[in-house]
Every structure is written in C-alpha cells, then in structure tokens.
A protein has these predicted regions:
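Eukaryotic scaffold repeat domains enriched in small/polar residues
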Residues: 1-164
Length: 164
C-alpha cells in the first residue's frame, strides 16, 4: 500500500501481516512526495507513481531502489498488464499546473521493461481547469483502456489503444 501522509510504502503478506516499510518525505531517489499509485511488473518489481516528484520509482521486493523514470510525467494512476505494458494516468499537467513543463495531461502507454513511452491519449477536455481526466487507469485483454475520472465530470471513460 502507498500512504501519502507519511510518504511511505508498506508491504504486507497475504494474511495482512506487516513485512516492511520504506521511504520518507523528500525529493531524493527513494523518497516520496505523494506516492499515488502502485503496480507490479512480470519480474516482481514494484512501480511507485511518486506524483509529487513527477516520477516513477522502481523497487525490488525488499524495497531497494532499482531505477527512477521521469518520462511518464506526473502520474496519479499506474497499471502494468501481463505483457509489461505500462499505463500511466497524468491528471495534473497542462492547464491544471503549467509549472509541469511541456507535459500534456492524459494517459501514457509504454514499456515497463525499457521505459519507452509509445503513445499518449490526451485529455479529451484539455482546457478544463482542475482535475478533469483519469486519475486511475486499467486495461483489459482486448485493448480497451479505462480511465477513472474525478472532478466536475467524474465517471469512467473507455479508450481503444492505438494500433502500431
């Protein structure tokens, strides 16, 4: 589980017993500012959407930092499918927070193995002030991508992944 108030990640076993915790508030690698989502790849690596630091941090099962990626932008939600395709929901870049450089709000799709971003599904309401696009994201085996939206619109939107 990711706990935003203490900026730590906690690991539990299947019976709910606490195994370990790691991280603290900060901007250095291994620290967090609003860990907002978690996902596991096929290798058992833990991907943490560290939204406040505009990055993904990747850890092993013991909480050791393996890598830090910035190319997926400011993620609120993260999902990795059985083929190690990474889906990241950025609900705060662009018109919501112009300080986040040239990032465009939307869902980024790429590789959990190489870190390459392959596609962007832009926010369908790019001029909306506030959080209007997906904060949560998941995909099914048929290529449908679902975004859980918050803000004035709310609800679930379905997107179809572009064919390469």
């Amino acid at each position: 589980s990711a706990e935003g108030s203490t900026n730590r990640v906690h690991k539990f076993d299947a019976d709910g017993n606490h195994l370990l915790s790691f991280g603290e508030w900060g901007t250095e690698p291994g620290n967090f500012r609003q860990p907002h989502g978690l996902a596991m790849d096929s290798k058992g690596r833990l991907f943490v959407a560290d939204r406040g630091n505009d990055r993904i941090q990747i850890f092993d099962q013991e909480g050791n930092l393996l890598d830090v990626w910035h190319q997926f932008s400011r993620l609120s939600g993260i999902y990795i499918d059985e083929n190690d395709v990474l889906y990241g929901a950025d609900s705060e870049s662009g018109s919501v927070n112009p300080d986040h450089g040239d990032w465009v709000r939307g869902i980024r799709i790429g590789s959990a193995i190489t870190g390459e971003v392959e596609f962007l599904i832009p926010d369908p309401q790019p001029d909306c002030r506030g959080t209007c696009t997906a904060e949560g994201v998941v995909a099914d085996a048929h290529g449908n991508i679902f975004g859980a939206e918050v803000g004035p619109v709310g609800g679930i939107k379905r997107y179809v992944r572009p064919i390469k």
